[in-house]
Design a protein with these regions (language model features):
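Signature of N6-adenine DNA methyltransferases within the class I
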Residues: 1-108
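Polybasic, glycine- and aromatic-enriched phosphate-binding surface used to engage nucleic acids
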Residues: 76-276
Length: 276
């Protein structure tokens, strides 16, 4: 077993054209001192002046949280642990079901623009879609937001073919399915394991969305136009009796943001990824 662990992280990307975070892991055996310590550096040039003795080790806690919690001081960690047991604070899971967004198996095929929708007469088998983080604006997703996305030529519709015999489909719908098969869209793993590759499973309209990957701050958005989302966002269905507006107001504060930083992970390029 390792007695001491040193982690070195970087503010800037280390490898050109690769937007992934790099962490240097140093493990040491032996000695009486035990714990973990973290050094934050701007870039590789900082190794020239790095002094490992300037930062002491913290006691390693064997808990479920990610190691990013060791970025905070002992006093800050004590405050965070106090908040966890404070009955004035609750978890999202106390108010609703949280699930990943729809896994289409092929977003390019199942998420379409208005132009493609019109070409294959797909309007009656599509749902308003949030396909990317750039589709979300503000704390509500409304019909006006959806209309703007459509006008901008975004893939703002999800194809949701019905679970009825194929012979009952319109000729235009059959044509689009044939187009997918001719171009190999049905060969991907997620599509190939379905009974009918062109029917997307687990489609339901959520009450709210929680953005999976965030740049400025972790977005929580209420659904105001019966939209659905791909797995770029998480979807929330509130329990009966829960007021979504109150949950929305309660979420946007510094404490919530602090917990998303601690529980989430750095995806690279300054992006924070949050998983249910």
């Amino acid at each position: 077993h390792l007695q001491k662990i040193t982690l070195i992280t970087f503010e800037e990307l280390v490898f050109p054209n690769i937007e992934q975070e790099v962490v240097v892991f140093i493990g040491e055996k032996g000695g009486e001192e035990k714990g973990i310590r973290i050094f934050e550096m701007n870039n590789l040039d900082d190794f020239d002046t790095l002094d490992l003795s300037q930062n002491g080790f913290k006691k390693l806690q064997h808990v479920k949280e990610k190691w990013t919690k060791y970025f905070v001081s002992a006093k800050e960690m004590e405050l965070i642990n106090t908040i966890k047991t404070d009955k004035r604070f609750t978890r999202f899971s106390d108010y609703g079901l949280i699930n990943v967004g729809i896994t289409t198996g092929n977003n390019n095929y199942f998420s379409v623009t208005d132009e493609v929708c019109e070409m294959y007469d797909l309007e009656d088998v599509t749902l308003p879609l949030i396909g990317r983080s750039s589709h979300l604006h503000g704390v509500y997703f409304t019909s006006q937001d959806w209309d703007e996305n459509r006008k901008d030529g975004k893939r703002a519709r999800l194809i949701y073919f019905p679970d009825t015999p194929l012979e009952q489909y319109s000729e235009k719908h059959k044509e689009y399915i044939k187009l997918g098969e001719d171009s190999g869209e049905d060969k991907g793993y997620k599509c190939s394991i379905r009974d009918r590759w062109y029917i997307v499973p687990s489609v339901w309209v959520p009450d709210a969305f929680f953005l999976r990957r965030n740049n400025l701050y972790p977005k929580f958005v209420l659904n105001r136009c019966n939209a659905v989302s791909t797995d770029t966002t998480h979807r929330i269905k509130f329990y009966e009796g829960v007021d979504p507006e109150l949950v929305l107001i309660s979420y946007y504060n510094s404490i919530s943001f602090a917990f998303t930083e601690i529980c989430g992970r750095s995806y690279g390029g300054g992006v924070l990824e949050i998983l249910p």
